[in-house]
Swiss-Prot record:
GO molecular function: cysteine desulfurase activity; iron-sulfur cluster binding; metal ion binding; pyridoxal phosphate binding
Protein name in the entry: Cysteine desulfurase, mitochondrial
Residue numbers carrying N6-(pyridoxal phosphate)lysine: K292
Catalytic activity entry: (sulfur carrier)-H + L-cysteine = (sulfur carrier)-SH + L-alanine
Catalytic residue list: C414 (cysteine persulfide intermediate)
EC top class named in words: transferase
SUPFAM superfamilies, per the entry: PLP-dependent transferases (SSF53383)
Residues given in the record as pyridoxal 5'-phosphate binding sites: A161, T162, N241, Q269, S289, S290, H291, T329
Gene Ontology cellular-component annotations: cytosol; L-cysteine desulfurase complex; mitochondrion; nucleus
Superkingdom of the organism of origin: Eukaryota
Matching PANTHER family: CYSTEINE DESULFURASE, CYSTEINE DESULFURYLASE FAMILY MEMBER
Cofactor: pyridoxal 5'-phosphate
Amino acid sequence: MLRQVLRRSLSDSRRPLRSVGSISCSARASGIGMRAYSSQIFKEGMQLETHTDIQSAAREQAQERMGSEALASNNSVLKHAYQESVDHGTRPIYLDMQATTPTDPRVVDTMLKFYTGLYGNPHSNTHSYGWETSQEVEKARKNVADVIKADPKEIIFTSGATESNNMALKGVARFYKKRKNHIITTRTEHKCVLEAARSMKDEGFDVTFLNVNEDGLVSLEELEQAIRPETSLVSVMSVNNEIGVVQPIKEIGAICRRHKVFFHSDAAQAYGKIPIDVDEMNIDLLSISSHKIYGPKGIGALYVRRRPRVRMEPLLSGGGQERGFRSGTLPPPLVVGLGHAAKLMVEEYEYDSAHVRRLSDRLLKGLLSIEQTTLNGSADHRYPGCVNVSFAFVEGESLLMALRDIALSSGSACTSASLEPSYVLHAIGRDDALAHSSIRFGIGRFTTEAEVDYVIKAITERVEFLRELSPLWEMYKDGIDLNTIEWSGH
């Protein structure tokens, strides 16, 4: 099967890297393979190489800088992991799918011709170069719309979900500000939504930030009570990027429609991964990200309902492209890449969903078998590809350092540069200790069963090792109730 070949190619972390001067997408074929694409034939046994000399140099520098410390460790597990991931030049297992996904080689293949022969400006309507690229852009627009059962005319291409979210919140709020100046969102939204909402407060808007329960779900009753006559917009994300909780989008949409309030949802983590029907769910605006669905980075979209029409004030001034909402020349390679990625999400939805759920169940069962581990967020209303677990008595950052052979994100930071506990985990009632001990695992199309088994084994060993260094773990094992201890500060 082609997807099995692609999965082995993209996620085989045991494969050594070869240094090349530039990024290459070369296939070495052996055995049998039958499916052809426009510029490459993918066959059984192909290997995809996507590294550069820069990565090789960075790896060598990391080895020089950290090698002595890592090799000095008496712990064989950590040393073995370090040596495999650095000394022998193998890539870590990638389980950070909520941050980004690998670009599907079939998507890359579709994009290539737009960097060579089909390089026309899609907005040039006086010659064939513009006509042909415009035609391909509109095909991509239809593919993007089909995922959410929308009209292609309702899809506005943007640079990504951050721009889409800002466009939705700021554009709607500013257009209706003379009659309505109230916005509702939740405390667990993505940073770009929270910051956009806060910037609206600086402009004089009133913003309500709704709490969520311990499962990470918003209360429908509290939402309805928060709506006022002057409320213009409600923004609630479909799937949370940290804990994978799926909000009751259909019910929220019904409430908003009943009160004649526009409903926006950040679907960066949901688009193509859970069923979405914008009409059935009464969604008026929906943000889309390409690189979360195995498409290229730097492109996204915003669904904007036409009936009843949603009006927005544009963020950018210019030539009035994209129905006047988003001026600027579209990048055909990226747009077509997003379109093909969306098409694949539809075609392979059943397979991908079953694959992700099976591996997620396997991973979660293995992780929760470790003593004193907790799943963060709802167990029932959750996208399976996002698994967030707290390991008590272990610092999440320390665990990540011990897992150099696995690419993961810590649930203890809302951004990679921050050392503050996750605001999402705080919102669902986790204390600082548990928030700091959380790790997010992302499973996707190219994740393999062997990788999941390796991760379970590695996590189990290294959590045990780090806990042996913790005095609190020793006290817990001795039966001491840590909640009864009065800690003194100095």
